[in-house]
Structures are given as structure tokens and as C-alpha cells.
Amino acid sequence: MHTYKVTMVERQKDGSTHTLTQTAHCRDRQEVIEWYGLEQPDIVSYTIVQID
């Protein structure tokens, strides 16, 4: 398992955006993408940084 810092920008229903940063403990980057649903249309952008 690795530790990742995940920062994502979500588009809200009113068109505004919201930035959220979380820490994830996952096997790899692909698991982070799947776990947080980062390929969903409401996600404007994201960054994943491995911190361990």
C-alpha cells in the first residue's frame, strides 16, 4: 500500500467549482482514480501525488 495526496476540483450543480484534498491509502494510482471516481464528468481536474 502507498499513501497518496489527492486534490480534485468538482463542478457543483450551480456551475461553481469546489476543491477538495484528501489522503488515500491504495495499491496504485489507478486504484485511487477508481476509488474517488475521478473519471466522472463532474470532476474538472485532479492531481495525485505519492507521498511515501
What positions do the PLM features span?
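A structural detector for beta-sheet-dominated domains
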Residues: 9, 27, 49-52
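Short, mixed-charge low-complexity intrinsically disordered segments
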Residues: 38-52
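Low-complexity, intrinsically disordered Gly/Pro/Thr-rich segments
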Residues: 28-37
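A short, exposed loop/beta-hairpin motif centered on an aromatic-Gly-Thr core
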Residues: 16-27
